[in-house]
């Protein structure tokens, strides 16, 4: 782990996102220390899941422990797209109550609620959201960058990104998307919305 982090930062990776599927922070200590030693940004990602144990107090206390570990930021890793908009409000507020660290949001569009979840999370205080350029967005990917930029335009959350430049980037990648679909590299089954995700709770990366 230490060598991987060292070589990653040496080769230009500045943010090391570190997570444990059980949210057991003991399993993250080595990677966090390694990232800090190499002057990298140590971001701990919390795997969002449902269950009686995962109360707002649980998330608040976990955020406090993460800050005490010396991490630089917290990422909410909603790998299955289970985080609903108003639950995102509560979750971000709980993390903000427990820590002063920046909060980054990561979710998948599999269940169809991701853009709304981002909107409520940002309104609640989330500092960063993960998006994808439109040719590779939606489905098991993330909300489209261009959509979120336009959503926040003219508000206190305005990104300042130029839609004309984003359009050029999207045009550049569009042929790659079409080729990936044509070759079968990109499966059309993962491009749409499947509300059953909220029932079977399978992460986007497994679909």
Name these PLM-found stretches.
Residues 1-17, 21-207:
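Catalytic cores and adjacent flexible loops of soluble metabolic enzymes
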């Amino acid at each position: 782990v230490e060598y991987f982090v060292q070589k990653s930062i040496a080769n230009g990776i500045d943010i090391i996102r570190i997570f444990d599927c059980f949210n057991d922070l003991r399993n993250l200590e080595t990677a966090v220390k390694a990232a800090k030693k190499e002057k990298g940004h140590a971001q701990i990602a919390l795997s969002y899941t449902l269950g009686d144990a995962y109360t707002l107090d649980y998330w608040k206390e976990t955020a406090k422990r993460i800050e005490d570990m010396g991490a630089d930021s917290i990422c909410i890793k909603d790998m299955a797209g289970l985080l609903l908009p108003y639950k995102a409000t509560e979750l971000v507020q709980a993390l903000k109550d427990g820590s002063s660290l920046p909060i980054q949001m990561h979710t998948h569009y599999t269940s169809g609620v991701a853009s709304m979840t981002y909107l409520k999370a940002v309104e609640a205080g989330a500092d960063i959201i993960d998006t994808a350029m439109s040719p590779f967005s939606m489905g098991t990917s993330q909300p489209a960058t261009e959509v979120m930029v336009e959503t926040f335009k003219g508000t206190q959350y305005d990104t300042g990104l130029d839609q004309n430049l984003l359009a050029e980037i999207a045009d550049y990648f569009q042929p790659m998307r079409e080729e990936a679909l044509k070759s079968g590299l990109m499966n059309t089954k993962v491009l749409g919305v499947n509300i059953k995700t909220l029932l079977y709770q399978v992460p986007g990366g497994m679909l």
